[in-house]
Curated annotation (Swiss-Prot):
Reactions catalysed according to its record: a di-trans,poly-cis-dolichyl phosphate + GDP-alpha-D-mannose = a di-trans,poly-cis-dolichyl beta-D-mannosyl phosphate + GDP
Region of interest: Polyprenol monophosphomannose synthase: 594-874
SUPFAM superfamilies, A to Z: Carbon-nitrogen hydrolase, Nucleotide-diphospho-sugar transferases
Region (Apolipoprotein N-acyltransferase): 1-593
Provenance organism: Mycobacterium tuberculosis (strain ATCC 25618 / H37Rv)
Keyword Glycosyltransferase: yes
Pfam families per the UniProt record, alphabetical: CN_hydrolase, Glycos_transf_2, LNT_N
InterPro entries assigned to the protein according to its UniProt record, in alphabetical order: Apolipo_AcylTrfase, C-N_Hydrolase, C-N_Hydrolase_sf, DPM1-like, Glyco_trans_2-like, LNT_N, Nucleotide-diphossugar_trans
Protein known as: Bifunctional apolipoprotein N-acyltransferase/polyprenol monophosphomannose synthase
Function: Catalyzes the phospholipid dependent N-acylation of the N-terminal cysteine of apolipoprotein, the last step in lipoprotein maturation.
Cytoplasmic side of membrane: 1-22, 90-93, 195-205, 527-874
Length: 874
């Protein structure tokens, strides 16, 4: 009966939770479809605003957790990219199409996680927009050089916000669209809250910020629009030239395009001859130069004389230079392993080849195969990838004396390619493209990207495709003339040669980095506000009833120290508030207790450490061991020494035995049969020392980098109450000597990465000079430690803090070894990157679960927060 009553009581809550989750799932799917609708062939620019508004609604919902934000963002991205990229699957099947869509969807997933973390900050629509721009930047560089296809800005070629791209490039346009969408959501949520309270009083003040943001975006677009609108008319002093585009077409679409090479070349020659005939008949204008598409001559004209003769005949017939697309062998490569460049080369009538541009951003899986040892086993199409290598240069060729920028095919989607051409002096942009392996949808989307570039850089853009769509685009983004898809045709049009540099051309990368930096900064601020970074806590003086043998601030009977009211900030929910991050600051069940700087003097009643064991792992340290042993026994005569030797081939183990014989009872040696890493050596030493009732166990390197003369600082800190005393290079008073700058940068980067990932306020978490109380080591599951290298130090520190023990950093002087060779390797770095990330995620998820179980610490969202301090007991 009791079970039945409990189930009946839970049913309404369960139904509500399921209904709420299903609603968010459906809204995420609809949002992904709407974002797709903003791109060609739909061209519903407004759908992007609605899509991001709906996604913002999902991510600001109080029931959406950080993991939920990741999931909803991933679902949104998957629906969007699966809908946007089906043209990939038409020729290679669903596998590569879905794999690419899934990879791209990871980035909106990252945005979803970011958004849930920062949503409680004042002005969250701004941070959402900044975060969206940052994830688009990340997708433009990762993986394998990035894939910017699908950036929100590229769906705005027909929209009223397009002028923003001239101010700050694609990044600013995407940010503006996201800001409008998120601002509308914020306004709607505040109006809803105001309405639910009966509409009493004035309009909600929280709508002012998002409304102002929307107005600012629209105002910026309106200010720039007149200049964009009249860009095609020129200033009156700009020269004009006539440009012709030849679209020769291919016999059939598909991946066997290369088998049609001669037919494709002949098609472009014949279409150029038709253009020449029309010029001579007065039906077309005489062009100053002609643009052929990418791969219009996939027969190298320098190797095949017949191909060169055909191109020369076309150039002489039209009486103008032709920019042809071809491939060229990389000199010096063996015949069985050739490489090529994807080249656009100027072919002058009478004199032949002249200036050239080698494609600088080659396409993975199409023009080259990354990680062939893996992908050859995953797809039968992998071996059809080319062997192209990237070129270099300014991205500018001179045709008939005109500097023309070349962005070959998919280079147009990367900000850096057209910008490099313009900064290199290009007065006109051209996009030679080969879309014979895809379909009309892909060509329409690429054409939209070219329109955005025309406005961004205030240049005419000439698009030439083997199968279409070819077009001439004005600087206002409008099409002057275009061809249909999959038909032979030519275009001729007058264009103006422009030299003005737009703000986006000049400062676009700077704005991009500002947005990325702002996103990184705001997420750190949000993580701190959400309680992810513990604050340094100082020990409290012991009361007269405290156990005299317990460290300060801690009773052996009561466990970890209680925290005062000022230690944590708890955010109280507003009445009627919709949002909750699930990240309110709370008291974790295990607590760390940390201090930094000079060690405190021993508290009254604390007995100094009596039995201290210094563990020194060795491998090929024969030159260093006698020196460090002598310095240690002179500096701290009372400590015992354990040398753990990993079968050093240089005789270090035998030398250690001699030192032990000369110092009986104080120096000991452990011989291990194999070199299993630094971590395994220390674990063996810990087990040896714990079994012999040592009260303090110290880690020390044999190479002299850890000064034995400074060991007393660590022991004083332990006697003062620390469970783990770390000899720190990076707290006040700590220094590093004779270290190569690369190692110093690596060390500081590793510490910063670990500190941020784990949320631990320890400055030198990778330090290897440290002293442990035996109680701390006994509480740690040492059998579960499998880390090696310096990751071992991070692992033990993380376990010590997670178990609620006191960690203290004391300053030391670290000196680089003078003798022997460092054991640092790339595998140590890879291990740390992976494991620290995993520990950080696991720790934050456990904190998140704890916070969600505590509704009294939930935090409100869009309209700001009221902060109060309170102590929470478990």
């Amino acid at each position: 009966m009791k079970l039945g009553a409990w189930v009946a009581a839970q049913l309404p809550t369960t139904r509500t939770a399921v209904r709420t989750r299903l609603t968010r799932l459906v809204v995420s799917i609809v949002a992904g479809l709407l974002l797709y609708a903003s791109f060609p062939p739909r061209n519903c620019w407004w759908a992007a605003v609605v899509a991001l508004a709906l996604l913002a609604w999902v991510l600001t919902h109080r029931a959406t957790t950080p993991v939920g934000g990741l999931g909803y963002g991933l679902l949104f991205g998957l629906v969007f990219y699966v809908s946007l990229l089906p043209w990939i699957g038409e020729l290679v099947g669903p596998g590569p199409w879905l794999a690419l869509a899934t990879t791209c969807a990871l980035f909106p997933g990252i945005f979803g996680l970011f958004a849930v973390v920062v949503r409680l900050l004042p002005g969250w629509p701004i941070w959402f927009a900044v975060g969206w721009a940052a994830q688009e930047w990340l997708k433009s560089i990762l993986p394998f050089g990035g894939f910017p296809w699908g950036s929100v800005a590229f769906g705005q070629a027909e929209g009223p916000l397009l002028p923003l791209v001239q101010l700050g490039g694609v990044a600013l346009l995407s940010t503006g669209v996201a800001l409008v969408g998120c601002g509308l959501t914020a306004i709607a949520l505040e109006i809803e809250k105001w309405w639910r309270t009966g509409g009493q009083g004035d309009a909600p003040p929280a709508v002012v910020l998002p409304a102002a943001c929307i107005c600012l975006v629209l105002f910026a677009a309106i200010v720039v629009w007149p200049q964009v609108r009249h860009a095609g008319s020129g200033s009156g002093g700009e020269p004009t030239v006539t440009v012709a585009v030849v679209q020769g077409n291919v016999p059939r679409l598909g991946l066997d395009f290369n088998a049609q090479r001669r037919a494709v070349l002949d098609n472009h020659v014949e279409e150029t001859l038709r253009l020449a005939a029309d010029v001579h008949a007065g039906l077309a204008q005489q062009p100053q130069f002609v643009i052929w598409p990418e791969n219009s001559s996939d027969i190298d004209p320098f190797v095949n004389p017949d191909a060169g003769q055909r191109i020369s005949a076309a150039a002489e017939a039209i009486g103008a230079p032709i920019l042809i697309g071809t491939l060229m062998d990389v000199p010096g490569r063996p015949r069985e392993n050739p490489e090529w460049t994807n080249t656009a080369i100027v072919w002058n009538p009478g004199t032949g080849p002249a200036d050239r541009h080698d494609k600088a951003i080659v396409q993975p899986f199409g023009e080259y195969l990354p990680m062939p040892w893996l992908f050859r086993h995953l797809s039968g199409y992998a071996d059809r990838a080319g062997h192209f290598v990237p070129g270099n240069g300014t991205g500018v060729v001179r045709i008939a004396g005109v500097p023309v920028g070349v962005a070959t095919c998919w280079e147009v989607i990367f900000d850096r390619a057209p910008r490099k051409s313009i900064l290199g002096g290009a007065q006109l942009l051209t996009v030679p493209s080969n879309n014979a392996t895809f379909n009309k949808t892909m060509s329409e989307q690429q054409l939209a990207f070219a329109k955005v570039r025309a406005v961004e850089h205030d240049r005419y853009v000439v698009v030439a495709g083997t199968t279409g769509i070819s077009a001439v685009i004005a600087p206002d983004g409008g099409e002057l003339i275009r061809t249909d898809f999959f038909q032979p045709a030519y275009l001729d049009s007058q264009v103006r040669l422009k030299t003005r540099l737009t703000p986006a051309t000049r400062w676009g990368p700077i704005l991009q980095w500002i947005l990325v930096g702002a996103a990184a900064a705001v997420v750190l601020v949000a993580m701190r506000q959400n309680g992810w970074f513990p604050r340094p806590r100082r020990s409290e003086p012991k009361g007269e009833n405290d156990d005299s043998d317990a460290p300060p601030g801690r009773s052996e009977a009561s466990g970890p120290p209680a925290l005062s009211e000022s230690d944590d900030e708890l955010i109280q929910p507003e009445q009627g508030g919709r949002h909750s991050s699930g990240f309110g600051r709370h008291r974790a069940t295990s607590r760390s207790y940390m201090t930094t700087g000079q060690p405190a003097p021993p508290a009254p009643g604390n007995r100094p450490s009596q039995r201290v064991l210094v563990i020194i792992p060795t491998f090929n340290e024969r030159e260093n061991l006698p020196v460090i042993h002598r310095r240690l026994t002179q500096a701290c005569p009372a400590v015992h020494v354990l040398v753990v030797d990993d079968s050093s081939p240089d005789g270090t183990g035998q030398l250690a035995d001699e030192l032990a014989q000369a110092d009986p009872g104080r120096t000991h040696v452990m011989h291990r049969t194999a070199k299993n890493g630094l971590g395994a050596a220390y674990l063996a030493g810990f087990a040896w020392g714990l079994s012999r009732e040592y009260s303090v166990l110290v880690e020390m390197d044999a190479d002299g980098s850890h000064a034995p003369e400074q060991l007393q600082r660590l022991l004083d800190a332990v006697d003062a109450g620390a469970d783990l005393a770390i000899g720190s290079r990076y707290v006040a008073g700590g220094t590093v000597r004779n270290w190569p700058w690369r190692r110093l940068v690596l060390s500081k980067t590793a510490n910063t990465y670990s500190r941020l990932a784990l949320g631990i306020g320890i400055h030198d978490i990778t330090a290897g000079y440290r002293a442990y109380r035996r109680e701390a080591l006994e509480a740690i599951d040492l059998d579960g430690v499998d880390s090696k290298g310096y990751c071992f130090q991070i692992d033990l520190t993380w376990r010590t803090v997670s178990n609620g023990f006191v960690v203290t950093e004391v300053p030391i002087t670290f000196t680089e070894r003078e003798l022997g060779v460092s054991k640092m390797s790339g595998s140590n770095i890879r291990e740390a990157l992976v494991k620290v990330a995993r520990w950080g995620i696991e720790g934050r998820l456990s904190r998140s679960d704890h916070a969600r179980a505590r509704p009294d610490i939930a935090r409100p969202g869009a309209g700001g927060s009221r902060v109060s301090r309170a102590d929470v007991t478990e």
